[in-house]
Structure formats: C-alpha cells, structure tokens
C-alpha cells in the first residue's frame, strides 16, 4: 500500500467553496439583521451559517482521517445468545379436520386439472 497521502484538488476546492459560501451567507444575514427591516430570525441565521462552515471543514477532516486509517473491523467474538422467552412463540398451524368433504372435492378438482394439463403438454404434432 502506498504511504503517500492522496490529495484531491476537487474535494479541497469543494470544501473551500462551501465554507466561503456559508461564511458569506452568515455575513449577509448579519447585515440583514443590522438593517432597519432585520429580525431576530436573521440573527439566528447569522449565527448558524458559520456553524455550517465549520461542519464542512470538520466533515472533510474526518473523511481524510478515515480514508488514511479506516476503522478496524469488529473481531469475530462469540455470538450473543437470545435469552429464552424474549421472542414470542411462533403460531402453530390450525389443524384441518381429516374428513372435510369440501377439501376432498377441491383436491380432486385440482388433480383433474393437473391431469388435463399433463395430457395437453404430452401431445405430439404428427
């Protein structure tokens, strides 16, 4: 693996542009607050935009740090057991009565359809 640091000019330019843009918007909101039509909402935004600029630099710094030394994968420790009684029991299927005439008739109908389908599939063109 290479020991040289990777520089990404496009990413650095993006961080600089985003930071400058956030600081410019903060300055704009500050001047709006100081004007005669300024409100406390403008003051809130004037204080928020520098935080957004700081976050752009912080996120880039963490990105570079994680890229240089990625976090260690978790070690293959023992799998955790689920305590008994934590999960609900699976429902049991309802038992059908063995002598259900409707079910018997339906199954016979399905068997007849399967035979007809098999006959149609086995036809040869001669």
Swiss-Prot record:
Question: Would you tell me the protein name for this molecule?
Answer: Putative lipoprotein LprD
Q: Does the keyword S-adenosyl-L-methionine apply?
A: no
TM region(s), chain numbering: 40-60
Gene responsible for this protein: lprD
UniProt similarity note: To M.leprae ML1177.
Q: Name one GO cellular component term.
A: plasma membrane
Q: Any signal peptide, and if so, which residues?
A: 1-21
Keyword terms: Cell membrane, Lipoprotein, Membrane, Palmitate, Signal, Transmembrane, Transmembrane helix
Annotated region Disordered: the residues are 70-101
Lipidation feature positions (S-diacylglycerol cysteine): 22
Lipid-anchored residues (N-palmitoyl cysteine): 22
Has keyword Transmembrane?
yes
Q: Please, which domain of life does this record's source organism belong to?
A: Bacteria
Any idea where this protein resides? Cell membrane
Q: What lineage does the source organism belong to?
A: Bacteria, Bacillati, Actinomycetota, Actinomycetes, Mycobacteriales
Organism of origin: Mycobacterium tuberculosis (strain CDC 1551 / Oshkosh)
């Amino acid at each position: 693996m290479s020991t040289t640091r990777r520089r990404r000019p496009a990413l650095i330019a993006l961080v600089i542009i985003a930071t400058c843009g956030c600081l410019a918007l903060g300055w704009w909101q500050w001047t709006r607050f100081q004007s005669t039509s300024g409100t406390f909402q403008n003051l809130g935004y004037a204080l928020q935009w520098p935080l957004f600029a700081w976050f752009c630099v912080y996120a880039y710094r963490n990105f570079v740090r994680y890229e240089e030394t990625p976090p260690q994968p978790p070690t293959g420790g023992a799998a955790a057991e689920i305590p008994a009684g934590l999960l609900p029991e699976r429902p049991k299927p309802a038992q059908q009565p063995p002598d259900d005439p409707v079910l018997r008739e339906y199954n016979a109908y399905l068997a007849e359809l399967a035979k007809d389908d098999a006959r149609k599939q086995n036809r040869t063109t001669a």
